[in-house]
Structure formats: structure tokens, C-alpha cells
Amino acid sequence: MADHQARQSGSSQRTVIPDPQLAKEKSNLTNYLRVFAYATRWDFCVYVVGALASIGVGVTMPLMNVVLGQLVGDFSDTVQDPYNMDLNNFKSMLQKQSLYIVGLFLGRWLLNSINKFCFRMIGIRLSSAIRHHYLRSLFAQSIHVIDSMPPGAAATAITATSNTLQIGVSERLGTFVTYVSTIIAAIAVAFTRSWSLTIVSASLLVYIAIIIAIVVPIYLKANAATLKADAQGTAVASEALQGIRLVNACGAHERIISKYSKWVTKAMERSQRVAPIIGAQTGLVFFGIFGVFGLAFWYGTQQFIHGVIKNVGVVIIVLTSVMLILFAFSYLEQPIMAISQAMVAATELFKVIDAPLPPMGSFTPDINSKDLIFKDVTFEYPSRPGARVLDGLSFRIQAGQNTALVGPSGSGKSTIVGLLERWYSLKHSPVLPEAATPRSSKEGERDNHDERKYERSTYEVPIMVPTNLTGALSGSISIGAHDLDDLEGKWWRAQIGLVQQEPFLFNSSIFENVANGLLGTVWENESEAKKRKMVQDACQEAYAHEFICRLPDAYDTRVGDGGAKLSGGQKQRIAIARSIVKRPQIMILDEATSAIDAKSEKIVQAALDRAIKTRTTITIAHRLSTIQKADHIVVLSKGRVVEEGTHKSLMEHENGVYYSLVEAQSLRLSTTDDTDSDLPATTYVAELKSAAVDIEQPLEVQNDEDNGPVVEPEVLRTLTQSFVKLLEGLRDQSSSFLLITIASMGVGAATPLQAWLFAKAVIVFISPSDDLKKEGDFWGFMWLALAGGVGVAYFFQCWISLRLQYHVGATTKQSYLRDMLYQELSFFDDDSRSSGTLIGRIAGDPKQVEGVFGLNLASATSSVFTIVGCLIISLTFGWKLGLVGLCVTVPIMMVSGFWKFRHELQFDQMNAAVFAESSQFASEAIGAMRTVSSLTMESAINNRYKQLLDGHVEAARRKAQWTAVIFGFAESATLGCQALILWYGGRLISSGEYSLEAFMVSYMAIINGVEYAGQILGVAPSAAQAAAAANRILDVQDSNRSSQEAEKSGPTVEDTDGGVEIELCNVSFKYPTRNVSIYKNLDLTIKKGQYAALVGPSGCGKTTIISLLERFYDLEPNHGEILWNGTNINDFGVYQYREHLSLVSQEPILFRGTIRDNILFGVADPSSVPEERIHEVCRDVFIHDVIVSLPDGYNTEVGAMSLSGGQKQRIAIARALIRNPKLLLLDEATSALDSESEKIVQAAFEKARKRRTMIAVAHRLATIQDADIIFVFDQGMVVEKGTHGELLQKRGIYWDMCQTQALDQ
């Protein structure tokens, strides 16, 4: 908590933080140690217990060396003087020492179990705490800071980065403590026996420390660079998955994959560049380890010759201690690497956690009946100094009145909303890092988002600069006598009810979504019954109650990811209910009815009119029919007020801006009778109530029990099946596998040879004194030769396996994203495959798989060769002892390792499932940051996230108890095996069957073989995680193959002039994940070159036709057909078919890159499009002048420029037209545009329609009144069709919709 409090500093004009260069130099180790500051007192107690247990585990093996040394000494005495041996005393001593080893085994089992349980639990607890603090710190930042973050970084931080940190503070840290204590204890034991020999042996420590000091900084730097490139790639994948419909419509799969591959390849190359350095480190370390054993052996013989060491047991204790240090150092490699990666991960996470917080006010005054006053407000976004959004803006919003803000796109309307919501400030405008979590594109703002160019690395030190360097900020916004910046932020937002153009709903029940509006109010802690009553009242006010009650679960119906299971109008009414349930004093309606059809608009507008009667209201609208009754209308242009007044007074100025805006939206109603247009009040209210029920198609959601999503079950595969299938895709790496195998054979041969050399070393000490020096020199040289060979083998093994590992990771990432992008759209409709979940999988799953195919694979391979070599040499020198090892000890280690692996697999599957849930929740919340902020949901989101994490910790605690016991046994069983081998081998020596050399060779070979047998399955943690990840990857791959197999290579779409004829013949359809029929036997014909419009209430099936024409979904057999110039569209190859049509959706989506990149997004070969063609299309949609006015013109990065919603939409339209489609689909394509822009773009459409067929879905009827034919839908059927004039003459549903939107009555 202390560092959170320390971060808030500075004045209203300047926020000061430490110099960024100093921040960059902060030690990774310091940040790693800071992680432990999140531990509670109880956590520290558990840590102490776990650390003591780890130390105890580490000490057991050096104590075992003491026993072994004493036994060898006794065996040596027996061999030298067999006639004076007391057999009973020898057997008694043998039994005593064997029981002592059994005691060590039991103690090590207990301590290992405690160690594993404690470190695993604390690791999960600390990881959960860091994840929680990361999210909390992110939500405490200003909105524009989160706007500037690239998509996907949140998922990376909360999944892959946090997982890396968790590994480095849990079991791997415990392993590090264990082996460090082993090294220290081994040195202590050796030192007490012979300090001089120990000092010689300890030279190894200095040697390894020098190597590590050289290599680790290089590795850390390379790893940080890799993380940055990975984050860039994740951002590309994130955008693609969030905009998957647009990617499919544009056929931009390969473009996205190419862009993603560029970053993935860069990350791979950076990693592979450091692979030989890590290989050299490993080779040099193992050369030193084996070499120092030869040095210690040679020096020991010298000491023995001169009488300094008199007992061969002393030499054995020291030598085995050196060997133990050898093993301990070799085992330290992975823990050190894990801790190093955790240091980097901690630094990345703390960059966000430590980011300075914006100043917050503290006043909570009475604002009832107080006016809102804008006085000389000048505002520029931090990323756009010099580009004024508001320029000396002054106006007053009267208390209790409805003030409407109108004007063209980019005039500053939504910036005013941002200032009122305190998302931006006139006193401080910090520029914060691109190091944190991005916002999702699910929830956009239409005007002037502060999206900064992503030039620097994704993870960078926070930077704040003085406001005078970030753009002009002046003026004031006040309510009563109080400046908005002086008010307490959350309290102020709780006084505002905000309804945005693009409503965002959370993937929870309707009740929970509406009840979110009560957060931060006096009703937040009311009983559920009271809340339900308030929610129901609010829904009735918003005319949503009736359609909700018709759902299977009513208010408990879940709305899907982002509210995907609701129509646009349904979502908007839920959002309106959410905003009015808290009875706010101020209402802000930011295009609140833009997504609603004409009839629904009349209903909702009536609800809004009723809701705002006694409230101060700010209404932003492009559809001017919604603000005719406003008490005051403010007309904006270029950040200034150009006109003010009522609708009536402004319409008196025929040359005025407002008058021209109204004229642009007017509907021709010449065939209507004016006397009939106004209904009596009682009739109007009755009509509203009737329409609220009748126009709504039942919500297309499924009852979770009865009508669950129809998704294909995941294929269950064994670990072997998963990895064999993945290996099939790595045939091009067969040479790497071969080289790894050869190098692993060299590594595997080291241990059997070491056992033989060790036995020879023991025999040397019982040789005649004349031969001792000569033998000592010879065998010391043999140790040196072995060290050289082992160093070379380890160098190549590590280098090649790391290169393979990084290659596997890169190729898996690319194929994984490719398989995801090429899925059918129904794949993404399943709740378990939300964009947040898939982004987390893209970031995490390939990482898990690459770990198994790299060093872990090489380690397992060399372990197999080691076991085989050890068994061969033990059977050669002593077959009886070898058989005991083969038939008893090795099976024990293998079985215990198998059970360890099995429980670890189950644990990691549970771990992945829970963290996937929490990751999905966090990603969804970050994507809806504006909604979260406006509803003051930050605390609720944090608490819910913490509940998810706490639940995971508790589930992990229960599971970890059993896995810890099994782990403890598996990692201690080697001591039990040693007790058995020593006891049996001693009996063989005492009976004279074995010589000391035969026993020592067999004993050392069996013990080392047993150790490596356990290590084969010692990769359980990595393999367990990788197995689950591999299954998910293969499930996606198999699903994509099914899609590809379904792809037909039928007829080619003919390149015809003048458009195409579209026929829907007897079409029946329901969505794959929903059990509700959309159409039953629908027939519809659109002639070649026609401009057809589809209109009707929300949920009637208009947009579904667009989805079917785009082949987002295909009709099932015998459910009708859709014909393209007489050919069933299902007969065409889907990707080739989509090249001939373009889609412009209601919500414009622009991807990272330049404006030119976005315009050419749907073009297969962008280089083939001349620059003049790009300019021509942009001129047609009247965006060219805006683009060339930007500093970099068409090369302007989209993220570096805050484009208004209208500007974004015009770029999206240019993107559609440059493909020269035969069929142009417009799904509310002009709904985000102001009247002036709409008129311009409509003219562009009129020009574009001459050469193609055009189908438009529209709620704003003025945009389609010139259509050649208009189809009026209701409940999945065409109930009227004709031209605008013909339908008005019928005075039916269409006529009624026109009356609602008419502006000239």
C-alpha cells in the first residue's frame, strides 16, 4: 500500500516522477525482491517454513556423502586386510549405516513435501496478488492512458508474464534454495574433512560465478527485447481476433498473419542470437564441474602421498561432495533461468503498478439546481500538441434542462463528454507509458481518442511531462462554484448517467448489468430484493421489461460476450436502464438512440424524455429528430459554438448551420396527410406499450440448461498423441533433432564414464605407494579429457535445442493464429472462446509447447541415454547389483515419477482453467474501460477479480496437498534406493563375490541411473502445462482442417459488370449457438444493379442477411439457398467468393498501422494499387482533404492520430470501395456520421451504386429513401416492399416509421 500512496504527487500544473533514465536503471533484482512485499505475515511464515524445509532437503545429500565415505573406508579396510575382518561387525555396521540412510530418506520425503507445498502455495498467492495489483493500478490510470496502450498487452501481462513470475517465485525458487543449501552443506562437510582439498574444489564456484556474471546480463537484455517483440505480435493478434468479422469480410487473413509473423520472427531471431552464448555458458560450466573433480582427485592423491590425508574415506567424502556440487550446479541452471525471467516479468509488471496516479479531487458538494459552465475551454490531446479540439469554448448547461450538442464530426462533442466524465483534465495531462495494458476495441469513442503512436517498446518506463509540453490546456468547467477537477472523481461520476453510442454489456445476467448502475450510489449495498425492484422499474422506464420477461430466464438471462446475444436496440435499452437506475442528477446521452431502428427509437425516446424531465441533460445526436424537443441546442464547429437556441429559433435562420443539418436529414413525406401524423396522447402511450412487446423478436440466446451452444466436443488425446502430432509439423527440423540426439548421446555417456572413473579413483588410493603418483596423474588427465568432451556435448546440445525451441515457439504461434483466423464464425460465438480468452491462449499456449521441445526434450533424451549407459556398465561390472537396479530401483523411480507427472498434469489443467477465467474477465473489463469508469465499477471489478483469484488459490491449496506428498516421495526415493544398493552391495563384498572396483562402478552407475530415471519425468511441470496447451492448439487445428475440407473448389465467381442478382429462396436459418429460428421459408430477390434497403425493428433479422451473404454462416442442407447470378453461393470457394463483395459495418474498426494500410486492408496485393486510385476513392468519400492535412498524410499512424468517428467511418468506406466489389453491403454504415458528413458520404454511395448491387441495412430512413427497393422486415419476414413513395402510399409499417423520424412537422 505504501508505494501506491507515494505515487500520488505534484500540483495541478505539473506531475513529477523520478527521472526516466534512473527508472530504467532500477535493478531487475530489486523488482524481483519487491514481489515478496505483497506477502502477508502468514505468507512469510509459510515462506520461512518452506525455506527451512528446502534447506533441510539440501542438507540430506551431503550427510549421505558422510555415510558413503565411512562405508567406502570400511570396504577399503576389508579389501586390504580380508583375513582380519570380523564378518558380524561388518554386517552390523552395514545394517546401521543402511538404516541411517533410510532415516535420511524419510526425513527428505517429509521435508520435500513441505517444501513443495509451501513454495507452490506462496507462488500462487503472490502471483494472484500481483495480478490483482496490476489490474487495480491500471484502472486507477486516466482513460487516455489506457487508450494509448496497444491491444493484447493486458492479456500478455495477466497471463504469460504473470505465469512467468509465478514460476520464478514458487517451486523454482524452492529448488534454487535447495541446491544452494546442498552446495553450502557439501562444502562444509568437505571443509571439515580437508580444508585444503576443499579450497581447491571451491575454485569451481569462482569460475562459474565469472561465467554467469558475463552471460546473465546478455541473456536478460535479449529476453527483454524478445518480450517487447512478443507484445507487439500479441497486439496484432488481439486486434485481429477482436475484429474477426472484418478480417473475414476483407479476406485479410494472410495480411494479418504476415504482420504477426514479422514480430514473431523478430522475437525468435533475437532469442536465437543469444542461444550460442547460453550454449557456451552451459558447456563451460560443465567443463568446469567435471574438470574440477579431476583437479580435486589429482590434488587428493598428492595429499595422500604426503600423509596429509590418511583415510581414503576422507578423499571419498570430499570427492563425492564435489560430485554433489557438480549435480547441484547442473540442476541450478533451470531455476536460475526461471528466476531471471521472473525478474524481467516483475520489472514489466511494476512499470504499470508504479505508474503515477492522476490527482483526484476531494469535494462532494450539493450540486442540485446548479448549472454546468464551460468558460474559455481550450483543449488539445497529449498526443497531438498543436491540434486544438476545443478552442475557447464557452457555453452554459442549465440545471434541469435538456441541452443538445450538435455539429459535424470532429467538432468536439465527445471530447466534451470526456471532460465532463473527468476522463481528461484541463489542469493536468500526463503522458504515460505504452508499457501497460491496452484497451480492447470493443468499446470505442467516436471523437478524438488519445491513441498514441506505438513507436517505442511495449514495456517502457513511465514518462510524465509538464502540461505546457503536451498541448494547450486552459479555461475551466464548473458546477456551482466548484471546478470539476476539485470534485471527488468517483462521487462525481456517480451523479452522471451516461448512455453511449456503442453500449457495452458485461458477460453476465441482465439483472447484474443493470444493477451495475447502482455502484457508487447510496443503493449499492441494498438487499437483492430491493435492487431487483429498482432494476425492474428502470427497465420498465426504458421499455425493456416486456422483452426481458419473454426470455427463458428473464432477468437472469446471460447476454454473452460484450452483449453479443442481444440486438443493437436491445443492448441500448439495457444500457439506458443501467444509466437511470441510480437516479442520476445529470444525464449524458451520447448518440443514445443511434443504434435503434425507427420504431424502437420512438419507444426509447419516449422513455428518455420521461427519464430526463427533472434532470440536467446533455444530449449528443447526429439524428436530429431526437433533439427537436431539447430546451437548448448548441451548434459546434471546430471546437467553438457557432449557434445556440431552440429547434424553432434555429430553423428560422435558413442560412444557418443547424438549418442545413436538418435539411440534410429531411424525409420526403409528400404523400402523407399532415393531419394524421400526430396521434392523440392516449393512443400514443398505448402504441408505445404495444410496440415494446410486439416489435421485439425473442432474444436469440440459449437457456444454459436446455439450449446450450452447439459446439464440437474437444478431442481427448494422450500426451504422446499430442506431441507426435505436433512433431509431424516439424519434419523440416529433422536435422536439428538428429544433432540434438547426437549431442545428447555425448551428454548421456558422461555419467557412466564418470562412474567408472570414480571407481578407478577409489582404487588408486589402495594401490602400492610406488604406483600412486603415476596412477593419480593418469586418471586426473582422464577426468580432464572427460570434462572437455562433456563441455563440447553440452554446448551443442544447449545451442541447438534452444534454436529448435525458439523455432517451435515461433512456428506454433503463427500456425495457431492462422488456424484461429480461418475458423468459421460460429467458432467465435461460443462463450468459452471470447476474444479475451483466445488472446490469452495465443500469448500463453505456444510458450508452453516450445518449452517441451527445447531444453526439456534434450534433457529427457540425454537422461534416456544416461540410464541405458548406466545399466549397461552396472551389469557389465556387477550383474547382480545391476539387476537390482534394473528390476527394483529404476521401476520405483519411474513409477513415482509417473504419479508425480499425473498429479502435476491435473493440477496445471485446473490452474489453466481458473486463470483463463480470470484472464477473460480482466480482458473484458479493460476493453470496457469507459463503461467501467462511468459506472464507477473499478472497485467492483477489482473485487470480483480478486474473488476469482482467491477461489483459484483455495482450489490450488486443496490440490497441492496431495501433489506435494507425491512430489516429495518422487524426489526423495533415490535415497531409499541408495540404502538398498549399499546394503546389498556390502553383503556382496563381505561374501567376496565383488571387488571394491566392481562394487563402486555398479553402485555409482545405478545411483546416477536412478537419479536420471526420476529426471525423465522431472519435466512434469513443463510437460503438464504443455500437454493441455498442445491439446488446445490441436483442437483449433483440427477444427480448421474440418473447415478447409468443407471448402469446395467449385465454380469461379464470374467478373460481371453492373453488379449481381441476389436471390434468397425458401431460406430457413438459426444461429449455430442459438436455438431460435431467425427465418422460416424466407424469399427475397434483389435484381442486378439495384440499390436495396432492409429496414425494420431491432431483432427482426436484417443484419442476419448481411451475415449470410458474407458467408459468415452457411445454410444447412434442405434449408433453402442463396443464389448469386443463379449459382448457389455455397458452391463457391468462400475466400474467392468474398473477394467480390465488401462490407461496411456500423462500428468502424481500424487496425494498427498507417491510414494507407487500413485503406488497403482488404486488397490482396496492396502494391498493385496506384496512389492515384487511393486518392480517388478517398475523394469520393470526402476524406482525402482530412488525410493530406495530417503531418504524415496517408502515412500517418492510426494510433498516433485521434480520428473522429465520422472520419474513421469514411476510411472504412474507402476500404470497402477500393476493392471494387460487385456487391456492397452497408450495415448501418452512416449511423456514426453527423448530418453533414452523412450527406457527403451518401452522395459517394449514390456514385458508387451505379456499377454494382448495393444492399443497405438502415435505421435512419433518410439515408435509404432513394433506394430502388425497400424491404420492411418484422419477425424474420418481409411484410412490405417497394420504393419509398410506394410504401408511403400504403400507410403501413414503413409509413409509421417515417412519421417518427420526420423533422419538418
Curated annotation (Swiss-Prot):
Basic and acidic residues bias spans: 440-454
Gene Ontology molecular functions: ABC-type oligopeptide transporter activity; ATP binding; ATP hydrolysis activity
Residues the entry annotates as binding ATP: 407-414, 1096-1103
Span list, region Disordered: 434-454, 1038-1057
Gene Ontology biological process terms, A to Z: oligopeptide export from mitochondrion
Start and end residues of each ABC transmembrane type-1 domain: 48-348, 738-1025
Occurrences of domain ABC transporter (ranges): 372-663, 1062-1300
Glycosites: 28, 468, 507, 525, 1040, 1066, 1075, 1125
Gene3D superfamilies on file: ABC transporter type 1, transmembrane domain, P-loop containing nucleotide triphosphate hydrolases
InterPro entries: AAA+_ATPase (IPR003593), ABC1_TM_dom (IPR011527), ABC1_TM_sf (IPR036640), ABC_transporter-like_ATP-bd (IPR003439), ABC_transporter-like_CS (IPR017871), P-loop_NTPase (IPR027417), Type_1_exporter (IPR039421)
Keywords: ATP-binding, Glycoprotein, Membrane, Nucleotide-binding, Repeat, Transmembrane, Transmembrane helix, Transport
Membrane topology annotation: Multi-pass membrane protein
Transmembrane segments: 44-64, 99-119, 172-192, 199-219, 277-297, 312-332, 737-757, 780-800, 851-873, 877-899, 964-984, 999-1019
CDD domains linked to this entry: ABC_6TM_Pgp_ABCB1_D1_like (cd18577), ABC_6TM_Pgp_ABCB1_D2_like (cd18578), ABC_MTABC3_MDL1_MDL2 (cd03249)
GO cellular component: mitochondrial inner membrane
Compartments where found: Membrane
Entry similarity comment: Belongs to the ABC transporter superfamily. ABCB family. Multidrug resistance exporter (TC 3.A.1.201) subfamily.
Functional note: ABC transporter; part of the gene cluster that mediates the biosynthesis of the lipopeptides W493 A and B. W493 A and B consist of six amino acid residues D-allo-thr, L-Ala, D-Ala, L-Gln, D-Tyr, and L-Val/L-Ile linked to a 3-hydroxy-4-methyltetradecanoic acid polyketide chain. May be involved in excretion or internal transport of W493 A and B.
Full protein name: ABC transporter FPSE_09185
